[in-house]
Amino acid sequence: MNEAAKTLDGWYVLHDFRKIDWNSWKTVSASEREQMLNEFEALVSKWEGTEKAGKGSHALYSIVGQKADIMIMLLRPTMEELNEIENAFNKSGLAAYMIPTYSYVSVVELSNYLAGDSDEDPYENPYVRSRLYPELPRWKHVCFYPMDKRREGNDNWYMLPMEERKNLMRSHGMIGRGYAGVVKQIISGSVGFDDWEWGVTLFSDDVLQFKKLVYEMRFDEVSARYGEFGSFYVGNILEKERIPAYFHI
């Protein structure tokens, strides 16, 4: 049997996509809308407190296109906490005017493909910890997509020897490093959690960089031979102070 890559696992992640039922929302009185938005902002304030305590992170995004209107991205130490937050939101007044369109459950992951030899506990390394337990950047734009490694005929990633996979991932990673400071990415593993094997979340202040990065990686062997991709979602950061304006009728 081939050697499996070892992973370091951090916070659990929920990407929650919703459409807004604008027609129904328009029928609600201004005072009721205000009450529901106040309730939602109170939930977001609670999430902010968790983030300040270093026990999780979150961000809201306005999604472009018809796949969804809103994406809520949540990171927490346990799957139970994600479930509690999801249930609390579903019981809120605002959620009654939202239609779930997609969700993705995963855990922030670092693999040993690019790791060097060291006897230290990686969970005590500040750099590693910052990647496993990240505070989501408040950059202008987000791009999310799920992906698999292909398992077909001669293009079976899981049948390649470990050293070959390491070399391929090293080359693949060099492309990403070329976008350091321009694009931040969070890779989250979802084998056994969701329908794809990984979720990729990209952040940037220049939305065009998503296209440039993904296109350049298409020519790398890891993507060209072994990558399979799901739907792409792109959107813009929705800060708490902009929530009332976003839902204003």
Swiss-Prot record:
What residues make up the catalytic site?
Y145
Known catalytic reactions: Fe-coproporphyrin III + 2 H2O2 + 2 H(+) = heme b + 2 CO2 + 4 H2O; Fe-coproporphyrin III + H2O2 + H(+) = harderoheme III + CO2 + 2 H2O; harderoheme III + H2O2 + H(+) = heme b + CO2 + 2 H2O
What positions does the entry give for Fe-coproporphyrin III binding? Answer: R131, Y145, P146, M147, D148, K149, H172, Q185, S223
Enzyme superclass (EC): oxidoreductase
Q: Which GO terms describe its molecular function?
A: heme binding; metal ion binding; oxidoreductase activity, acting on the CH-CH group of donors, oxygen as acceptor; peroxidase activity
- Pathway recorded for this protein: Porphyrin-containing compound metabolism; protoheme biosynthesis
Q: Which cofactor does it need?
A: Fe-coproporphyrin III
- Cofactor stoichiometry and binding? Fe-coproporphyrin III acts both as a substrate and a redox cofactor.
Per the UniProt entry, the Enzyme Commission number(s) are 1.3.98.5
UniProt keywords, alphabetically: Heme, Heme biosynthesis, Iron, Metal-binding, Oxidoreductase
GO biological process terms on file: heme B biosynthetic process
Q: Which NCBIfam families match?
A: PRK12276.1 (NF008913)
Annotated family: Belongs to the ChdC family. Type 1 subfamily.
Q: What does the UniProt function comment say about this protein?
A: Involved in coproporphyrin-dependent heme b biosynthesis. Catalyzes the decarboxylation of Fe-coproporphyrin III (coproheme) to heme b (protoheme IX), the last step of the pathway. The reaction occurs in a stepwise manner with a three-propionate intermediate.
**Would you tell me the protein name for this molecule?**
Coproheme decarboxylase
Q: Name its species.
A: Shouchella clausii (strain KSM-K16)
